[in-house]
Design a protein with these regions (language model features):
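Beta-strand/loop-rich accessory regions of lumenal/periplasmic or secreted enzymes
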Residues: 2-186
Length: 186
């Protein structure tokens, strides 16, 4: 597969090259994202226009690639740090700093999947199976370990895990009750 980055350091395109038998075939090109991933900061003045700096590649090894982008707006700035692993996992840290007193209404990351890559769903309260046409009604619940969602099909998909600075990986199986997730600070 291939990941292409937008100027802000977030994925603009994720392409899977697998056939129906789950065999790699470079002649097949199936897009996972319908639109580039968007990081949005909404203030009382409206949506902040974040202008990205040039992508700075910090480190590259045979197994990882790390980069950084600074996003500057009129009232806030954000730092996007990313590390891509050999298996396609990308860990992002998005840190937002107010440049002056500002009322923030919402901070969100928007992932628009293609129909191809959103046949099945699991997480955020959905037990797994075909993706419903309705909106998912979800709220943080530390008992239910609902901090992630996966959308995809047999050949492609994407899992998004929500973390903050106090994130602690949940325990599984018989230890489930002893390792509940923590509410995020924000």
């Amino acid at each position: 597969g291939t990941v292409k980055l937008s100027a802000d350091g977030l994925p603009a395109s994720i392409v899977a090259n697998y056939d129906q038998a789950n065999q790699l075939d470079r002649s097949i090109s199936n897009e996972v994202l319908a639109k580039p991933v968007a990081f949005v900061v909404e203030t009382s003045k409206g949506t902040e226009k974040l202008k990205p700096s040039k992508i700075e590649f910090l480190k590259q090894t045979p197994a990882t690639l790390e980069w950084k982008v600074l996003l500057k707006g009129s009232d806030v700035e954000a730092e996007c740090l990313a590390k891509m692993l050999f298996d396609g996992t990308i860990n992002y840290q998005l840190k937002v700093t107010a440049l002056r007193d500002v009322q923030v209404k919402d901070i969100r990351t928007v992932f628009d999947y293609t129909h191809y890559a959103s046949k099945y769903i699991m997480g955020l309260g959905v037990k797994g199976g075909a993706r419903p046409d309705s909106t998912i009604d979800w709220k943080w619940d530390t008992i239910k370990q609902q901090d992630r969602i996966w959308l995809g099909n047999v050949n492609a998909g994407m899992q998004v895990v929500f973390k903050d600075s106090n994130y602690k990986r949940p325990l599984v199986n018989i230890y489930y009750e002893f390792g509940r997730i923590r509410y995020p600070h924000s």
